[in-house]
Swiss-Prot record:
Domain of life: Eukaryota
Name this protein carries in UniProt: Germin-like protein 2
GO cellular component, as recorded: apoplast
Keywords: Apoplast, Manganese, Metal-binding, Secreted
Main localization, broad class: secreted
Organism listed in the record: Betula pendula
Protein localization: Secreted, Extracellular space, Apoplast
Complex formation: Oligomer (believed to be a pentamer but probably hexamer).
GO molecular function: metal ion binding
Length: 14
């Protein structure tokens, strides 16, 4: 369930 969270976090970090 981290893959989905990472996708959102990366969007903000990016």
């Amino acid at each position: 369930a981290f893959q989905l969270d990472t996708n959102l976090v990366e969007s903000l970090q990016k």
